[in-house]
Amino acid sequence: MIERVKTTKLSEASGLPKTYDPVGTENRWQKAWEEKGAFKPDPSAPGDPFSVVIPPPNVTGSLHMGHAFNTALIDTVVRYKRLKGNNVLCLPGTDHASIAVQTILERQLKEEGKNRRDLGRASFLEKAWEWKEKSGGRIVDQLKRLGYSVDWSRERFTLDEGLSKAVSEAFVRLHEKGLIYRGEYLVNWCPASGSAVSDLEVEMKEVDGHLWHFRYPLVTSSVSSAKQISYLEVATTRPETMLGDVAVAVNPSDERYKDLIGEKLTLPLVGRTIPIIGDPHVDKDFGTGCVKVTPAHDPNDFEIGQRHDLPQITVMTKKGTMNHNAGQFEGLDRFEAREAVIDSLKEIGLLTKIEAYKHSVPFSDRGKVPVEPLLSTQWFVKMDPLSSSCSEFFEKGQPKFIPNRWSKVYRDWLTDIRDWCISRQLWWGHRIPAWFVISQTDNKVVNETPYIVARTEDEAKKLAREKYGDSVKIEQDEDVLDTWFSSGLWPFSTLGWPDETHPDFQRWYPTNTLVTGFDIIFFWVARMTMMAGVFTERMPFADVYIHGLVRDEQNRKMSKSAGNGIDPLLLIERYGTDALRFALVREVAGAGQDIRLDFDRKNQTSATVEASRNFANKLWNATRFALINLEDQDYENLESYDSSKLQLSDRWILSRLARVNHETANRYENYALGEAAKGLYEFAWNDFCDWYLELIKRRLNNSENLSSDELLDRKIAKSVLYKVLSDLLIMLHPLMPHLTEELWHGLTGLDEDQFLALQPWPKSNEQDLNLDLESSFSDLFASIRLIRNLRAVAGLKPSQKVPVMLVSGKEVLQKTLTTSINDIAVLTKAKEVQILSPEQAKSLPSMKALAGVSGELEVVLPIEGLIDIASLRSRLEKDLNKAQKEIESLSGRLANKNFVDKAPKDVVEECRANLTESEAQVRLVKERLMGLD
């Protein structure tokens, strides 16, 4: 650490090129940070621990704008905490993405006319690891381009040795607690990938389909005869599943059918007799009020079947073809079978109606085909005990969601949960640590425990031999675990768990902040809290910052399918990483809000990011200006001067600096990152660059004929310049790390390995705060803007110097104006500046002048004899006439009730705003015309 004071070495302005090269600068500092281990923390180092484990991107992935947004938010928080003196660990890693990788590899094999079983498991996994090593580093390299201040030496991969050990340990412990079981249940089955898929891997798509109505004949009975009913009619979007129907359900309160409950129907095409059952979950007002029940192929039907102890008849194979239970339709693809069933029902006169029907169909995100609810023997985690534990923590406020509205979503998920299917019929992933007992020689029947769960194969063999004898043989389950199982352990497995004595676990667990999108609260955030609750008895993070989506300029969600995604690397190459990061964070209106990012596809440009690049250029040029004026180092630390010697402009900028310091730190602390970016932008661009640098230019002159007071004033100006710029760069560092690192080194002249990223946050001197002075300077700047505006109205040439009168009855403002009279004259090209009280202004002789008012200040610009008054009057009268016509037009539209009631709300509001603006314009022009009389 170094103290931020004037150093013995200072770069000349030539140390910074005239133009800013963002890509070159960023590459250089990213390399320096990593080579010097700038972000590699020591667990024993001082400072309160602060840790973040980044959401692991898929190893198959490539950088998209969501990654860039997430990175910008996380790294802003992390870099700020480092500046505040915390012992920070930001740990990176990637996810093995089992389905995604396996899909890619199987596609490659298919092109070669092979499949994974042709290779065998060992060869297939060898090929998968080769692919991962070759292609999997792309996303990491791209993340590095974003300037992530993570410890790359601690980078983890969900299939690496340590995490694999943690996964096996977690599985064994959950099984020992009775929280993992093996059972038959309906799962989302993807026929294309040949595996169960999680709910997250299912995408609901609106499909134009049909609703087919057909009849089930009643088996004749006294009840049916009395009611003169010979059939029940049902409707379905999936007629092929009727081959597995085991009942038809009606609502027991439905007067039409309640007397038929317990009667029998004949299942068409199959001939099976099935019962009519009563179930209160049937909506008697939907359709015919009769629902076909297929427990083996529909989740709702499965629940009905469980309640009524109905059989489960599966009519499809895992490849999506019809099986032997489908009778004459065996071997047909499920969609071919659909058409065949419809034709057969039509042929026997039981098809009654076909209607167009738009409905949601679940598709496999990876396989891109409709998933099939299929009965399958899988491994499950009992979720109720886990969610109950999390609910107890939640009642204590753990974790805290930012914004708070997402806590309700999290709580609702905890209270509406079903057991989690964790097995996948894949080879790439964490193989389930369970071994089936397949044979023994002592003729004892092995039925009480058909499998052994263990951490390793050796442990499994030992347990099996102890239970079944030395000759027992075991074979490991072929399936792998759902990727979300290992992801659920991410916050603590990456820190050394299950070894809770590991220095990283001891120092940085629980972690502090998780930054993620709202779309995986269900699937990742909640599973992490559940896993942490059961294994560490603590929540894995204190805060969960939920960010929104990146949308395009038309407010559409960015996605590949919509064709409106933007490649972050393209914008990085054009504008720089810092410009992109700053633009993304600055667009955040509030925590959790979506942001918009424009993009001109023809020119490959973004006005939003370009504005941030322009801001970077502004800072670059301001620092070059500072270096030119600070290179002689004839100034001291600001604290060494008598504060009474500071000019009002110095006190004003130091007051603004103190306030911005306090506000920025508070905003960073409370995740108001967008507000932090906006506040720093306004301070840097307006207060520092546009005003303070202009105000001190005349004080920085290098004349040798200066008095001792002038020399002291010059030194003070330089000291304030150094202080403000240095502190500004540090406060901006979390948002624009590369640029600020470069400029700060140029300013301080320190060695390259003394990083700004590791410096302390600047101290804020509350004694510098002076809100009255800030208010007066706001009025001062308003007067300068008004004078410039009046000069433009008068059509004065830039070289023309005219007198200016400033009228105010506010004593503090008068003092500020009087002290700054020379600055006003220079910045407005005034011949002379008079500061008058209202009483003094009244005693002035009548004159032709332009005037304007801003707050408690009136500006008068005498113009008689300087311009052609008649020409100006004519121009103003034209402006007045134009504004009055605009008022007439707008008033007419707003008086039209039909327009106000039927036009879009934003159009009406815009019309009202334009009317208000035009009315103000009329008043202003009239005032200016009066000044010419």
Swiss-Prot record:
Coiled coil: 866-932
Motif 'KMSKS' region: where in chain: 557-561
Enzyme nomenclature, EC number: 6.1.1.9
Stored InterPro entries: aa-tRNA-synth_I_CS, aa-tRNA-synth_Ia, Anticodon_Ia_Val, M/V/L/I-tRNA-synth_anticd-bd, Rossmann-like_a/b/a_fold, tRNA-bd_arm, tRNAsynth_Ia_anticodon-bd, Val-tRNA_synth_C_sf
GO molecular function, one term: aminoacyl-tRNA deacylase activity
Locations listed in the record: Cytoplasm
Region (Disordered): 1-24
GO cellular component: cytosol
Location (main, coarse): cytoplasm
Gene3D superfamilies referenced in this protein's UniProt entry, alphabetically: HUPs, Isoleucyl-tRNA Synthetase, Domain 1, Valyl-tRNA synthetase, C-terminal domain, Valyl/Leucyl/Isoleucyl-tRNA synthetase, editing domain
Source species, domain of life: Bacteria
Pfam families membership: Anticodon_1 (PF08264), tRNA-synt_1 (PF00133), Val_tRNA-synt_C (PF10458)
Residues reported in the UniProt entry to bind ATP: 560
Domain free text: ValRS has two distinct active sites: one for aminoacylation and one for editing. The misactivated threonine is translocated from the active site to the editing site.
Subunit annotation: Monomer.
Annotated family: Belongs to the class-I aminoacyl-tRNA synthetase family. ValS type 1 subfamily.
Biological role stated in the UniProt entry: Catalyzes the attachment of valine to tRNA(Val). As ValRS can inadvertently accommodate and process structurally similar amino acids such as threonine, to avoid such errors, it has a 'posttransfer' editing activity that hydrolyzes mischarged Thr-tRNA(Val) in a tRNA-dependent manner.
UniProt-recorded name of the protein: Valine--tRNA ligase
Naturally occurring in which organism (per UniProt): Prochlorococcus marinus (strain NATL2A)
Lineage summary: Bacteria, Bacillati, Cyanobacteriota, Cyanophyceae, Synechococcales
